Amino acid sequence: MNRRLLVRSISCFQPLSRITFGRPNTPFLRKYADTSTAANTNSTILRKQLLSLKPISASDSLFISCTVFNSKGNIISMSEKFPKWSFLTEHSLFPRDLRKIDNSSIDIIPTIMCKPNCIVINLLHIKALIERDKVYVFDTTNPSAAAKLSVLMYDLESKLSSTKNNSQFYEHRALESIFINVMSALETDFKLHSQICIQILNDLENEVNRLKLRHLLIKSKDLTLFYQKTLLIRDLLDELLENDDDLANMYLTVKKSPKDNFSDLEMLIETYYTQCDEYVQQSESLIQDIKSTEEIVNIILDANRNSLMLLELKVTIYTLGFTVASVLPAFYGMNLKNFIEESEWGFTSVAVFSIVSALYITKKNFNSLRSVTKMTMYPNSPANSSVYPKTSASIALTNKLKRRRKWWKSTKQRLGVLLYGSSYTNKANLSNNKINKGFSKVKKFNMENDIKNKQNRDMIWKWLIEDKKN
């Protein structure tokens, strides 16, 4: 029985694959087909974008290009490519030091790193590595810096090959030629910026022009960048002079300790430090001149703006006067009875009244405008009465108040005489005498109290002195 039931149940059982996959859902397939086509289009667009990007070549990422000078100043190799990793291991450098000498066009902070076997230099357009018998000058991708580097090549070749000054070490001669090239580049940049800025400032003294102000703003930004560059180089040289360990490591031919004498190297660095400091001071003074000129120009523009506003207010006041003058004739110009049609003085009186009212309104507005324009810092200060004299309105107000006080005092006395008779004056005099006597009594009492307090203080001091003696 159980077997039969089991067979029937198995025969009635339908596999799940027939239910789910026997009749596929066509909307689901369409939707899936749409999403797949969209994904294919997105992948093709992404593939095109990736193909449009320029890949970094292996030579740029794994090699470094530089020109090498030997101990006699001759060029051994021109723009020779070295593997970066082998170059780092050969000169005992770290991978982080490669950022200082990489031939990228990105400007970074100037640095001079003193290693045990070499000196790594990054100053403006110059990226070099100095050893005791070799100099590596790294190539640049900036076309404007390439011309300056070519000048450096000639200077290095002449400086290192000369045998006149044998007392100076090889590394110091290479360092001096690099400093000379850097200072000459700074000098040319400063002369260019200063000539243009001074010319614009001289032109602005004669005429304030919008185009000149715009040109001055652009050149002031360039001058600020130059000032920051020179300031960084000056601070770098200052740090070198203050650090004895770096000065000792800059001797590669003959090793020295921090306790030795570095007078020759200090004199070399001090010379170019003062020259760089001069460029810093001159550029800073020129920036201050530009700022002061900008402030003066702003003051002039504000004054012109205020004068235009005053002109507009004056025109408005005149317009108001004409409007007031035309109000009354406009009323009488209506085709209605005004009861002065047959009067002989009607026209004259209306015209005179309108003109007088217009003149009165105009004068009053001009007086108020004049009082607003004449502003002082401390108009009511008694110490500055000679510098800031009182206006006629304030003097008239004080005189008016004085007259009112006198009038009130006289009217008070007259009312007292009318109400109380002649005895009022006697009473007033008696009250004044009583008040004076009261004040004198209070004053006398205060003086007596002061004397008593003084005597008591003297007695207390005497007692204290006697107690100390005992």
Curated annotation (Swiss-Prot):
GO biological process assignments: mitochondrial magnesium ion transmembrane transport
Q: Where in the cell is it found?
A: Mitochondrion inner membrane
Q: What is the effect of changing residue 97 to A/F/W?
A: No effect on Mg(2+) import
TM region(s), chain numbering: 315-333, 345-361
- Please list the GO terms describing molecular function: cardiolipin binding; magnesium ion transmembrane transporter activity
Q: Where is the transit peptide?
A: 1-32
Q: Which domain of life is it from?
A: Eukaryota
A Pfam family hit = MRS2-like
Q: How the protein is affected by changing residue 309 to F?
A: Decreases Mg(2+) import into mitochondria
Q: Does the keyword Cytoplasm apply?
A: no
Quaternary structure and partners: Homopentamer. Forms homooligomers. Interacts with MFM1.
> What job does the chain carry out?
High-conductance magnesium-selective channel that mediates the influx of magnesium into the mitochondrial matrix. Essential for the splicing of mRNA group II introns in mitochondria by affecting mitochondrial magnesium concentrations, which are critical for group II intron splicing. It also suppresses a variety of mitochondrial intron mutations and its absence may disturb the assembly of mitochondrial membrane complexes.
Its UniProt miscellaneous note says: Present with 768 molecules/cell in log phase SD medium.
- The name under which this protein is listed is Magnesium transporter MRS2, mitochondrial
